[in-house]
Curated annotation (Swiss-Prot):
It comes from the Bacteria. NCBIfam families: argG, PRK00509.1. Homotetramer. Signal peptide: none annotated. HAMAP family: Arg_succ_synth_type1 (MF_00005). GO terms for biological process: argininosuccinate metabolic process; L-arginine biosynthetic process; urea cycle. ATP binds at A8, Y9, S10, G11, G12, L13, D14, T15, S16, G117. Pfam families: Arginosuc_syn_C (PF20979), Arginosuc_synth (PF00764). PROSITE patterns: ARGININOSUCCIN_SYN_1 (PS00564), ARGININOSUCCIN_SYN_2 (PS00565). This is Argininosuccinate synthase. The gene is argG. It catalyses: L-citrulline + L-aspartate + ATP = 2-(N(omega)-L-arginino)succinate + AMP + diphosphate + H(+). One of its GO terms (cellular component) is cytoplasm.
């Protein structure tokens, strides 16, 4: 039986180099699978053709934009998904979807192996391989960039040596990953933490200092799902795309951070995620109005744990599924409208309304006629601090 390797193909340096290498190593055939996740830029037909030019026997392009938005971006919105309270999981949420389609392609096209172009330093190797082992443990996994110690310089030199049709060169050494949820840039001069990002690094966002006129917007939610923008019904994908355009024009969603990778090292990453940041900001504001205090407090911890699970490549793990169920249950009343102003790199919420709101004006107002019984407060304060009062009394007496 001829070996057949199903490769997660991006069209970039690492996976283009992987095609002839995999064919040589296995003595078999390579099937390239590329997903359209709304990354824009290069036409997907060009990507498909490049894989064939690099030696793939088949090259498959799958339009997965709506699936990505509905099944991966939307759960991230509901979970207010931010790793280290900053990173909206741009690459992390795309990997389990790519894994899903690679496994399906392997079953359909007689694949014996699956492969990716990730190095041994990154998180993506974990996300891919844990996913493969969860969904199709019978498939063998090959990671040529990691297992054969390919550095970027070696990969570029090899590509030039055999005239692989790739755009990357020694003058442009960045690793870029992008989809409709955002864009990630790493390596190159960014590896020196003191070097500031240059303007040409950014693609999804305008310079926040340009001084574009403020953009006021109303985002409507139904059970945690963005369903309308300025009163116009939208799908989840359309909501992300529109917010990418409008928030991106205001320079929203730029992030330069040093993150703690799963493999134990720290890595500098530059992200752009205008739509993600704007939608999560609005969703969080809607939750603040509609979710009860103790549930909201607990959910913040669940959201953080959910983000860690996803970042760590555990999308298909039992804990992640259980966290999904909890988060989904909290979204029942997350319905209403959020108005916010986007300007100079910031989203500022300035209006909230919901038929499910827990905000009671008569209780909250300080004007005459409020219904809050302040006579209850004195006893509440005494009881609230009673245990710490007793503990401190004991400690003073013991001194």
């Amino acid at each position: 039986m001829t070996n057949r390797v199903v490769l997660a193909y991006s069209g970039g340096l690492d996976t283009s180099v992987a095609i002839p290498y995999l064919a040589k190593m296995t003595g078999g055939e390579v099937v390239a699978v590329s997903l359209d996740l709304g990354q824009g830029g290069e036409d997907m037909e060009s990507v498909r053709q490049r894989a064939l030019d690099c030696g793939a026997v088949e090259s498959i392009v799958i339009d997965a934009k709506d699936e990505f938005a509905n099944d991966y971006c939307l759960p991230t919105i509901k979970a207010n998904g931010m790793y280290m309270k900053q990173y909206p999981l741009v690459s992390a949420i795309s990997r389990p979807l790519i894994v899903k389609h690679l496994v399906e392609a392997a079953k359909k096209h007689g694949g014996t192996h699956v492969s990716h172009g990730c190095t041994g330093k990154g998180n993506d190797q974990v996300r891919f391989e844990v996913g493969f082992r969860n969904l199709a443990p019978e498939l063998q996994i090959i990671a040529p960039a990691r297992d054969y110690a390919w550095t970027r310089d070696k990969a570029i030199a090899f590509a030039e040596e055999i005239n692989l049709p790739i755009e990357q060169s020694k003058k442009s050494p960045f690793s870029i990953d992008q989809n409709v949820w955002g864009r990630a840039v790493e390596t190159g001069f960014l590896e020196d933490l003191w070097n500031p990002p240059t303007k040409d690094l950014y693609s999804y966002t305008e310079d926040p200092a340009l001084g574009n006129a403020p953009d006021e917007i109303i985002i409507s939610f139904k059970a945690g799902v963005p369903v309308a923008i300025d009163g116009r019904p939208v799908t989840v994908l359309e909501a992300i795309e529109e917010m990418n355009r409008r928030a991106g024009a205001q320079g929203i969603g730029r992030l330069d951070m040093v993150e703690d990778r799963l493999v134990g090292i720290k890595s500098r990453e530059v992200y752009e995620a205008p739509g993600a940041i704007a939608l999560i900001t609005a969703h969080q504001a809607m939750e603040d109005v509609t979710i009860e205090r103790e549930l909201a407090r607990y959910k913040r911890g669940i959201d953080a744990r959910w983000s860690e699970e996803v970042y760590d490549g555990l999308w298909y793990a039992p804990l992640k599924r259980s966290l999904d169920a909890f988060i989904e249950n909290t979204q029942e009343h997350v319905t209403g409208d959020i108005r916010m102003v986007m300007h100079a790199g910031k989203c500022t919420v300035n209006g909230r309304r919901s038929e499910h709101s827990l905000y009671d004006f008569d209780l909250a107002t300080y004007d005459t006629g409020d219904t809050f019984d302040q006579t209850l407060a004195k006893g509440f304060v005494e009881l609230h601090g009673l245990s710490s009062k007793i503990s401190n009394k004991r400690d003073r007496e013991a001194q």
